[in-house]
Regions:
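Structured C-terminal cap/extension of enzyme domains
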Residues: 12-22, 41, 164-355
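Hydrophobic residues in well-ordered beta-strands that form the structural core
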Residues: 25-26, 56, 178
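Glycine/proline-rich, positively charged
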Residues: 14, 18, 61-182, 189-196, ...
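Short catalytic-loop micro-motif centered on adjacent basic/acidic residues
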Residues: 23-30, 120-124, 147, 223-225
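Alpha-helix-loop-beta-strand connector modules within alpha/beta enzyme cores
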Residues: 37-56, 109-112, 116, 171
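Glycine-rich, proline-tolerant flexible connector loops at the mouths of alpha/beta enzymes
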Residues: 23-43, 94-98
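Short, small-residue-biased leader/transition segments that mark boundaries at the very start
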Residues: 1-8
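Structural motif corresponding to the early beta-alpha repeats
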Residues: 30, 46-67, 91
């Protein structure tokens, strides 16, 4: 996690492994390109190779020719200090990226690395509609797993299509690894009626626990990824997943009611993937601004949310700086109307705060 020293990161790794967990997920761009090196220092140097499973991903948007696959892959092995990846993915595939990967030989590259023993299991992470996923899995039966955005809020969403994508994978007999089970942290922070509904089930259970268990309860899910920023989150996650219990009927019904309540709130369904940030000519930290926007919707315009907004625009562009070029919208896996939403954020915060 950004800003944490290696000593703390090692504590998190140790706590996780001591409790019997072993899967670590990284990728080329995570944490400004430093995540894989951190994995090398804090995990790989300190544990025998059979103590952990390591996944990383090919940054397909950087690939211009077949040789680039080799270049980035070798760089990733070196950064992580491993001779092979247990799981390796083509990163953030959608309709356009899959065509590029097919034209440049991305799928063949994964198969060749598997044949050489440098990858144990090949797959891809996916951000698009279910019909695109169906086409990919039909054309590429060699794919052993798919990583999908699944959470109870997006299950019936026409934007994300969690359920439809899950059912496509199930139809093809391809196991699912879940990402975004807590929807970028959104489902870990409940107030009002949603908070009351979940607290009534068990006042000691975290809101995040219901979201992660929801995803883990699906039969074709082999693994649920959950981003953990500190030891407290890690200890909470590992406590309820060590002795995993699928959701009961009562819990499923409660989650249904929570979704009904959440849908009444006009929050922005941003997952903080940050693909929109890279090409922004005004250096606007779009997901961070949307995060504060959502805080305002959920908790009101308070000193905390105002302070958070000031913090997010410190040293970078504010929402009102947007020139509406649309580069961000072309990158957004959630297909959000970012330009319009930035205008709304500027209206709420910048006018009120005279920025």
């Amino acid at each position: 996690s950004r800003g944490l020293g290696d000593v703390y990161k090692r504590q998190m790794v140790d706590s996780y492994i001591e409790q019997g967990f072993k899967y670590f997920d990284t990728a080329y761009p995570y944490h400004n390109g430093r995540s894989e090196e951190t994995v090398g220092r804090c995990l790989v140097q300190r544990y025998a190779r059979d103590r952990f499973l390591l996944a990383s991903k090919m940054p397909v948007w950087l690939v211009k020719e077949y040789a680039d696959y080799e270049k980035y892959f070798e760089e990733q092995l070196k950064k992580c200090q491993v001779e092979y990846f247990d799981f390796y993915l083509l990163h953030a595939m959608n309709k356009d990226r899959v065509k590029e990967a097919e034209n440049l030989g991305g799928f063949q590259f994964l198969q060749s690395m598997k044949a050489e023993g440098k990858i144990r299991h090949i797959g891809f992470s996916f951000h698009d509609k279910a019909d695109v996923l169906d086409e990919i899995l039909t054309n590429h039966p060699e794919m052993e797993f798919v990583q999908l955005q699944i959470n109870y809020y997006d299950w019936e969403s026409e934007n994300v299509q969690s359920r439809k994508c899950y059912e496509v994978a199930e139809k093809h007999g391809v196991p699912v690894i879940v990402m975004e089970p807590v929807k970028g942290g959104t489902l870990a922070n409940m107030v009002g009626e949603p908070a009351r509904i979940l607290s009534a089930l068990d006042e000691n259970a975290s809101y995040a626990s219901y979201a992660v268990r929801y995803a883990a309860s699906l039969p074709n899910v082999i693994l649920v990824l959950s981003g953990m920023s500190d030891l407290k989150q890690l200890q909470d996650n590992t406590a309820y997943m060590k002795d995993f219990q699928p959701l009961t009927d009562k819990e499923q019904q409660a989650i249904g009611k929570v979704v009904e309540e959440l849908e009444k709130l006009p929050t922005i369904p941003c997952t903080n993937c940050r693909y929109c940030v890279e090409g922004c000519p005004k250096k606007i930290r779009i997901p961070d601004i949307f995060g504060v926007y959502n805080m305002g919707v959920q908790f009101g315009l308070t000193d905390v949310t105002r302070g958070s907004y000031r913090c997010q625009i410190d040293g970078s562009g504010k929402a009102g700086d947007c020139i509406k070029c649309g580069k961000c919208e072309a990158q957004c896996p959630q297909h959000l109307e970012i330009r319009k939403l930035l205008e709304e954020a500027a209206d709420i915060y910048e006018k009120e705060m005279h920025l």
